[in-house]
Amino acid sequence: MADVLDRVVGQPDAVAQLRAAVDAPVHAYLLVGPPGAGARGAATAFAAALLCPDGGCGQCRDCRLVLGGEHPDVVVLTPEGAFLRREDAGEIIRLATRSPVEGARKVLVLADMHRVQDDGPMLLKTIEEPPPSTVFVVLADTVPEELVTIASR
């Protein structure tokens, strides 16, 4: 059966790991790759699989909403400007502590986290120990020092 993760092209090892994680996800995932490598698409497909009652069928309401960028329990956050601002970090922490709107979990996709700097430690505790209903998918071009702790887990 085809599923949403079949849409991720050229990353069979990453897809296999994400597919294996759908039934029992952990608190955070770090997807690293250069621009154009497909990390954002993989994160979206993974979010759909996590919220889908069938593990990512691609056809149900949850899958369609996630893939269309309209699911209330999936939030994609991209820092504005050259670096992650304190306000951005605060918003991420606030969103992480809110309950899901529709389902049992919510997914926060944190894009361009290679741009995190001084406020990285502020986010670290939230990313490492979110509420049980929150799954983080962290996207980065590289793994800067501030993300090493996340990468090591």
Cite the ranges covered by each PLM segment.
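P-loop/Walker A NTP-binding region and its immediately flanking N-terminal helices
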Residues: M1-D118, V135, V148
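Active-site catalytic pocket residues across diverse enzymes, especially alpha/beta-hydrolases
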Residues: L50, I127-P130
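Short regulatory helix/loop adjacent to the ATP-binding pocket of P-loop NTPases
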Residues: D118, M122-I127, P144-R153
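Sensor-1/coupling segment of RecA-like P-loop NTPase cores
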Residues: P130-L147
